């Protein structure tokens, strides 16, 4: 039994790696960190969106590629081979999975299409579910969330949050 990546998965992963090598050199990342490269960061993000990173797991009916978690793992490894100043795990893996498995039909239609079109990016707040931190706490009353979470995956780029 073969446990490696398929040809398609390896090809996708290699494209991500090559893109980062070409577009996100250490000098570019230093400029972004120094606050001189907001446009550069947006260009890198858009380039990776053009490769389909935002719609890997989303079903085709919602504008996605309908690939599997192994593709997402291969892409994650490709992103990890360089420096990728973009949201990925929260916005493009965890959020689509949560919506696909926990959302109603209207939520799936609304949010999965918007993720595929790069109109929304999700942050994921899980730590309060596991254990509250000192000086933090999130309370949900009815349809309102109030409080402070100390950690949210992809929170700095989020337009929406899943708690």
Map each language-model feature to its residues:
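Active-site-flanking structural segment that lines cofactor/substrate pockets
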Residues: 39-53
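Gly-rich Lys/Arg/Thr-decorated short loops/hinges at beta-loop-alpha junctions or inter-strand turns
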Residues: 25
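Buried hydrophobic positions in well-ordered alpha/beta secondary-structure cores of metabolic enzymes
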Residues: 9, 20, 52, 59, ...
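Intrinsic disorder at enzyme termini
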Residues: 1-8
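Conserved "HGTGT" condensation-loop signature of ketosynthase/thiolase-family condensing enzymes
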Residues: 14
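C-terminal helix-coil-helix/basic helical segment that borders enzyme active sites and/or dimer interfaces
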Residues: 28-36
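Glycine-rich, Trp-frequent "lid" loop and neighboring beta-strands that shape
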Residues: 64-65, 105-163
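Internal helix-loop-helix
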Residues: 49-109, 113, 117-118, 154-157
């Amino acid at each position: 039994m073969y446990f490696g990546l398929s040809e398609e998965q390896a090809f996708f992963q290699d494209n991500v790696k090559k893109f980062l090598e070409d577009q996100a050199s250490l000098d570019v990342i230093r400029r972004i960190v120094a606050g001189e490269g907001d446009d550069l960061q947006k260009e890198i993000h858009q380039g990776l969106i053009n490769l389909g990173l935002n719609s890997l797991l989303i079903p085709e009916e919602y504008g996605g590629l309908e690939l599997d978690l192994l593709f997402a793992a291969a892409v994650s490894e490709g992103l990890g081979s360089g420096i990728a100043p973009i949201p990925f795990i929260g916005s493009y893996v965890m959020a689509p999975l949560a919506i696909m498995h926990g959302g109603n039909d209207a939520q799936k239609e609304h949010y999965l299409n918007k993720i595929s079109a790069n109109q929304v990016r999700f942050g994921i707040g899980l730590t309060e579910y596991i254990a509250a931190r000192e000086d933090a706490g999130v309370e949900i009353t009815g349809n309102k969330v109030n409080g402070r979470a100390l950690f949210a995956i992809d929170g700095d780029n989020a337009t929406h949050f899943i708690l």
